């Protein structure tokens, strides 16, 4: 997709949302700058001669990471042989939009997209699931029993939402963001339990939030709590975004209504954010909004009937003196803490799908182990991985995928040509932290764990222009730019 077509999609999105001409002009200015600044190699790539090397490339996973990779391979090879294995019809749906569904800005239909409409021309689709891997013989098996061979394998299967680890939610087991067959409706609808990590659950998040607001309007004192688990998660800012947005929705109704709801964030970690500059600002924003936090709390159980969440709280105590190390031992202590709630937004533990995590291409922690720069498997040279499932220190965001898929494609072609893998992923990731309705802090950073803004503006400031970017520009850029392998 060329830039003119991409800008056309931006215009359609703005018209559909009915924003003012002034804001539309601002947004289009951001869109134009974004296509230039965020995609500096497009022109160079489009002018480069396609490689004549040939190999059978199989991609496991047909979401954003998998389809973007497939599209760029098609664009970069003169004789492409690319197969995508994906069981879902809606794998390319716009997952970042779930947060907006959870606060009534989007409807479910605004984020749902059919894979058939975005499958790159020339890519073969196997509508099934990879269940066994034999990397020593360059093949895998799908659930039908068919064995698929490959010369190169790309693993982009995303993450499973491990609700089953939370007592009280065992019947949900492992589910996925776009899974429409789970039992979430029965468990979440009208119970006060919510999450934006599943699209159907995001719908009930808004219903539960509205019910909480109605009760607060009656003068009732209520408790809203928000969890963050002890595993790596995709979009690490989402648990805070939904909290900011609930605060905004309550304040829309009235400051007195907001005052009736005590809001507390319970993360397992001891930090708000991994980059100090952003963490300092987030803490200050929480204080200004009268939003609380309690570190070192991991959600273990949800009693839906009695509306009680049980957390495991941990802390360290000084133990005995170690004469060899010349320091005191640290003793980890834990206790269970029951927290009553009226509204609970839970972020489920996440893991690699079992069929990958427990396979020879997985690792002790489940994620696919790769060199963090080349994204090549640490054991099998003809396997690459990217996106949420890759074991890299950062990178479980769509913004990371935008950088990673180009690295994977360039390095696969280099490997096919017998050349050194020179493309490097620098750890770039971005989290548009929605701090209110109309304000976003665009948190960009990389391996350095320092802010790395793409635009010459202070990245720690909340800005309306980043709201325009998040609300109106990023979705068409993702759906029509990245999925075509051009952005």
Please place each PLM-identified region on the residue numbering.
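A Rossmann-like FAD-binding core segment of flavoenzymes
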Residues: 79, 120-132, 247-365
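N-terminal secretory signal peptides
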Residues: 1-20
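A conserved FAD-binding loop/helix module that cradles the flavin
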Residues: 389-425
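FAD-binding core/adjacent interface of flavoenzyme oxidoreductases
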Residues: 14-31, 38-54, 126-241, 245-254, ...
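FAD-site-proximal beta/loop scaffold in flavoenzymes
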Residues: 170-218, 328, 337-401
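C-terminal auxiliary extensions adjacent to catalytic cores
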Residues: 53, 442-487
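N-terminal Rossmann-like dinucleotide/flavin-binding domain of flavoprotein oxidoreductases
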Residues: 77-150, 276-292
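C-terminal segment of N-terminal export signals and the immediately downstream linker at the start
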Residues: 38-78
């Amino acid at each position: 997709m060329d830039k003119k077509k991409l800008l056309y999609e931006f215009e359609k999105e703005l018209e559909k949302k009915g924003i003012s001409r002034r804001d539309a002009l601002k947004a289009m200015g951001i869109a134009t700058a974004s296509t230039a600044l965020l995609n500096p190699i497009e022109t160079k790539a489009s002018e480069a001669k396609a490689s004549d090397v040939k190999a059978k490339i199989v991609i496991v996973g047909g979401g954003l990471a998998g389809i973007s990779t497939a599209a760029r391979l098609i664009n970069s090879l003169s004789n492409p042989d690319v197969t995508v294995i994906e069981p879902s019809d809606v794998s390319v749906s716009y997952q970042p939009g779930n947060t907006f569904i959870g606060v009534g800005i989007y409807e479910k239909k605004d984020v749902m997209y059919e894979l058939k409409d975005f499958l790159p021309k020339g890519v073969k689709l196997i509508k099934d699931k990879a269940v066994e891997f034999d990397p020593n013989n360059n093949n895998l098996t799908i659930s039908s029993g068919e064995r698929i061979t490959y010369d190169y394998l790309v693993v982009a299967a995303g993450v499973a939402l491990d609700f089953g680890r939370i007592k009280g939610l065992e019947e949900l087991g492992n589910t996925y963001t776009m899974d429409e067959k789970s039992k979430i409706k029965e468990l979440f609808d009208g119970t006060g339990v919510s999450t934006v990590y599943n699209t159907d659950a995001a719908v009930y998040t808004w219903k539960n939030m509205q019910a909480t607001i109605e009760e607060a309007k009656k003068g009732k004192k209520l408790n809203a709590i928000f969890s963050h688990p002890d595993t790596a998660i995709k979009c690490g800012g989402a648990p805070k975004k939904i909290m900011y947005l609930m605060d905004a929705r309550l304040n829309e109704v009235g400051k007195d209504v907001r005052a009736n709801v005590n809001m507390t964030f319970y993360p397992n970690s001891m930090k708000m954010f991994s980059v100090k500059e952003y963490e300092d600002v987030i803490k200050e924003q929480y204080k200004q909004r009268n939003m609380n936090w309690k570190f070192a709390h991991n959600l273990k159980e949800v009693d839906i009937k009695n509306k009680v969440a049980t957390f495991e709280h941990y802390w360290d105590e000084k133990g005995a003196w170690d004469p060899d190390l010349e320091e005191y031992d640290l003793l980890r202590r834990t206790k269970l803490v029951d927290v009553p709630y009226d509204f609970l937004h839970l972020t489920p533990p996440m893991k690699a799908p079992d069929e990958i995590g427990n396979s020879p291409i997985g690792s002790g922690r489940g994620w696919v182990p790769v060199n963090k720069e080349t994204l090549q498997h640490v054991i099998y040279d003809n396997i690459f991985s990217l996106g949420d499932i890759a074991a890299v220190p950062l990178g479980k965001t769509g913004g990371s995928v935008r950088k990673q898929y180009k690295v994977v494609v360039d390095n696969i072609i280099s490997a096919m040509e017998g050349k050194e893998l020179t493309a490097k992923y620098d750890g770039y990731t971005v989290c548009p932290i929605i701090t209110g309705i109309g304000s976003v802090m665009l948190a960009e950073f990389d391996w350095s764990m320092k802010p790395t803004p793409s635009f010459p503006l202070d990245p720690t400031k909340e800005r309306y222009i980043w709201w325009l970017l998040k609300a109106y520009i990023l979705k068409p850029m993702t759906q029509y730019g990245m999925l075509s392998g051009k952005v």
